[in-house]
A protein has these predicted regions:
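Conserved Nudix-box catalytic region and its N-terminal flanking loop in Nudix hydrolases
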Residues: 29, 33-72
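A short coil-to-beta-strand element that immediately follows conserved catalytic motifs
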Residues: 73-83
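Short, well-ordered beta-strand micro-motif
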Residues: 27, 105-109, 126
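Active-site-adjacent beta-strand/loop module that shapes the phosphate/pyrophosphate-binding cleft
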Residues: 85-114
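Acidic, metal-coordinating catalytic segment for phosphate/diphosphate chemistry
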Residues: 1-24, 96
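Nudix hydrolase/Nudix homology domain
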Residues: 43-44, 115-158
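Short connector loops at helix/strand junctions that flank enzyme active sites
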Residues: 20, 40-42, 47, 74, ...
Length: 158
């Protein structure tokens, strides 16, 4: 399996050769814990998410990706923001794709299922809000989660 390498404002980053609309979902349970995955491609922690398929709505992609990566079915309840910083490039070593960041981050509530790892998630855990900051994650993911935890009145647009 290839690796995922995130570059931020790095002069040595590869030039982007793709832009793929994607979703991430900050899913919470009844206790307010966040659903977190430890990714198989870079060993970092993240909220679930992935590419939006042709013919699929944003909420449908979010629900599908969450279920595929975690075993949890969620209901989408809100929007954290949009993240499209051209200085953030993600290199996938398996195929040479250098993707410019483009992600819509939603809020979801867990409605069914049990945390179950997949081929994209080494671990799936409910993490108390106060413990999320201690997890290793890339800068962009940390910012997305911090925006959610801050309870911003308006979605982030950037």
């Amino acid at each position: 399996m290839g690796k995922r390498i995130d570059f931020y404002n790095d002069p040595d980053a590869p030039a982007p050769n793709s832009l793929v609309p994607s979703v991430n979902v900050v899913v919470t349970n009844a206790d307010g814990d966040l659903l977190m995955i430890r990714r198989t491609d870079n060993d970092n922690w993240a909220v679930p998410g992935g590419a939006i398929d042709l013919g699929e709505s944003i909420p449908a992609a979010a629900v599908r990706e969450t279920l595929e990566e975690t075993g949890i079915t969620c209901h989408i309840t809100g929007l954290v923001g949009t993240y499209s910083d051209p200085r953030h490039v993600v290199l996938y070593t398996s195929n040479g794709e250098a993707r410019q960041e483009f992600s819509i981050v939603l809020v979801g509530r867990a409605v069914a299922g049990s945390p179950t790892p997949s081929d994209e998630s080494r671990e799936v855990l409910w993490v108390p809000r106060g413990e999320v900051a201690a997890l290793r994650m890339d800068r962009s993911m940390r910012m997305r989660i911090e925006h959610y935890l801050a309870g911003r009145a308006e979605p982030y647009i950037g």
